[in-house]
């Protein structure tokens, strides 16, 4: 990246949701990724929704923490196709999901994510599937619990 481009980015007002969106979600906007996790101030949600109108990208609020929202931005067509992958469905089934249409998956994931944030429940590693991470990586994170890892002693 050129020095000019870097300087231009540094001068951008990162409090503006439009700038955050373009910089953090460029692969999603370009159709190269199916989803993106995005954290914004609560008072920016309306501007984000207006920005997404007619874009083909949807927004789902996962969690409110003070004045910050954690949202999942996603291309519904791309994500629905991916979530129908047999290995993805198997992982979800093994982790207690009962319905496998995109809306049901997103509702259940949202519930689990909120439980993780508010009730100290285990982290819902299926987030990796929703973000398009390699299936083998997601399976590995689900299978290997951090409680089984030990640090070397010196």
What positions do the PLM features span?
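Hydrophobic/aromatic-rich, well-ordered segments within soluble, folded domains that form packed cores
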Residues: 123-146
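Helix-hairpin-helix/helix-loop-helix acidic hairpins
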Residues: 101-120
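Short beta-strand-to-loop capping motifs
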Residues: 39-42, 73-75
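A glycine-rich, hydrophobic loop/mini-helix early in the fold
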Residues: 47-101
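Short, surface-exposed beta-edge/turn micro-motifs
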Residues: 33-35, 67-69, 124-126
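Short, extreme N-terminal leader segments that mark the start of a protein/domain
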Residues: 1-40
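Short, flexible, solvent-exposed loop/turn segments with mixed acidic/basic and small polar residues
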Residues: 22-31, 59-64, 114-118
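Conserved small/polar residues in nucleotide/adenosyl-binding loops
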Residues: 147-153
């Amino acid at each position: 990246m050129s020095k000019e481009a870097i300087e231009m980015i540094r001068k951008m007002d990162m409090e503006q949701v439009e700038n955050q969106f373009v910089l953090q979600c460029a692969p999603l906007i370009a159709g190269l990724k199916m989803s993106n996790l995005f954290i914004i101030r609560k008072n920016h949600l309306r501007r984000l929704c207006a920005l997404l109108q007619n874009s083909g990208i949807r927004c789902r609020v996962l969690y409110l923490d003070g004045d910050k929202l954690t949202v999942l931005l996603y291309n519904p067509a791309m994500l629905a196709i991916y979530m129908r992958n047999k290995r993805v469905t198997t992982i979800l089934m093994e982790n207690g999901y009962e319905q496998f249409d995109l809306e049901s998956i997103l509702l259940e994931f949202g519930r689990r994510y909120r439980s993780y944030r508010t009730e100290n429940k285990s982290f819902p590693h299926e987030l990796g599937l929703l973000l398009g991470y390699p299936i083998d990586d997601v399976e590995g994170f689900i299978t290997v619990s951090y409680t089984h890892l030990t640090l070397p002693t010196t």
